[in-house]
């Protein structure tokens, strides 16, 4: 699945150094150091993506004007000797264009950002990005007649408008990904406009690209949040893990080099440096293909594809198998050395080497699980250093680390057991009760959306073979929890959620699993308005009826977060009885008005609220 294999996109180092310093600081040659601008780069499209993502509410006309103005200025400043599309760094010029005329900053509330210096201005504008803002309606694919006419009249403008529409709704989407999706959209429009049934063609194919856009955008947003909140050390561990699993036959030095380069590329993408994001991506893909013999045989076929398909093929390639001949455990990786005698830098390098060795031996494990193993191993080594016989203690490390895998396996088994027993809807309700207790400050729609994702993940992962369920579940849970943490970052939920989100990336999921009830939450005074029942409960069907029932469940738990399972079952049984009684007769509204208050009185007495 995409979210599993595309976790390759999470990488290292919050660095703003030039490429030369990026290379020299680590003593490792970089594939990105030779800056050669691509004459084929479409700067109009890239600038459109930039302005649409940084000024999301700007109209297409306003964005087009900014694009025209800034490219006129930058083309003059670069001179005529350089090929079209060649500039060391247009990012500053793009940022200046947003602020240099008063109309845009004043109209869209950017004056505060624009009053700051260059770096602070950039960070301020980045912080204003909002994924799928409420003020912008969801993108709808235009009906075929209109689309095909516009496409035939001016294909370039049609696709540029598409880039504007998706970029403003998905401000964290990498520019390289946006261009890929636009090329995909181009093929869909071209094919469907020639189809006998254009409407059906548009509906089916547009649904596919919309799903891909949504998933990729969420993944890119997750990566940028990791870079923003956890910094170099955590990201280094994630990167080493991912690349060591992907290219398990590659040596440690090659992995280190690739980590640094990919890190720099992702940093630039997250900063909104649309031009460098694309160029770095192209150079990385070229480098990986030039090293296919060293890295992996699995990318050989990918490297024969055209550029656009090539990148997607490499990103979505499966992890290599564990190399033959590796020692079964890593107990003696330290040899006769005492971990606590290492300097801080030596400890970091050793842990990177341990993570590399462990990951290439466990290519099927989820990245978060290996991160917990590495974190636990470092704590174990530090503990051994305090013992009477450190070397003897260190030899028991492999056995000590099994508990992290076993904890995850037990949770996966328990979750899939519940899914098999309850099915999607009732499993979602179980998640709903649990997360309403953990985060009662979330609104009912937020809780329903969050737990629906969890239930969908269970439905997907639990269909896999048992050996794949853990990795699947951990990866999806990491992304879902990541979205919850982004929500907390924008508007704090409660201290417990904040602690889980910020204390340790590796331990996020176990932290949320162990979180039970928000002890700081004070239930609001009981309100009858939240528990008034009407005949629409009898008329609703499918998802609409399920949502009504779930809202009742949420309001109930919010009123009494300490509600026991037995109390909950009793109230649900009474509620089901009410529906059965009132929905069978003719006077449904009268029945609810008479029986509903009695149910609520009984419930309040039983719960003491």
From Swiss-Prot:
Tell me one Pfam family matched here.
Answer: Serum_albumin
Q: Which UniProt keywords apply?
A: Copper, Disulfide bond, Glycoprotein, Metal-binding, Nickel, Phosphoprotein, Repeat, Secreted, Signal, Sulfation
Q: Name one GO cellular component term.
A: cytoplasm
Q: What is the protein named?
A: Alpha-fetoprotein
* Localization, UniProt: Secreted
Q: Which residues form the Albumin domain?
A: 19-210, 211-402, 403-601
Q: Which family does it belong to?
A: Belongs to the ALB/AFP/VDB family.
Positions with a binding annotation for Cu(2+): 22
Q: What does this protein do, in the record's words?
A: Binds copper, nickel, and fatty acids as well as, and bilirubin less well than, serum albumin.
Oligomer status and interactors? Dimeric and trimeric forms have been found in addition to the monomeric form.
Gene Ontology molecular-function annotations: metal ion binding
> Per its UniProt entry, which superkingdom is the organism in?
Eukaryota
Coarse class of the primary localization is secreted
Annotated glycosylation sites? 251
Q: What PANTHER family has UniProt attached to this entry?
A: ALPHA-FETOPROTEIN (PTHR11385:SF7), SERUM ALBUMIN-RELATED (PTHR11385)
Which InterPro entries would you find in this protein's record? ALB/AFP/VDB (IPR000264), Serum_albumin-like (IPR020858), Serum_albumin/AFP/Afamin (IPR021177), Serum_albumin_CS (IPR020857), Serum_albumin_N (IPR014760)
Please list the disulfide bridges: 99-114, 113-124, 148-193, 192-201, 224-270, 269-277, 289-303, 302-313, 384-393, 416-462, 461-472, 485-501, 500-511, 538-583, 582-591
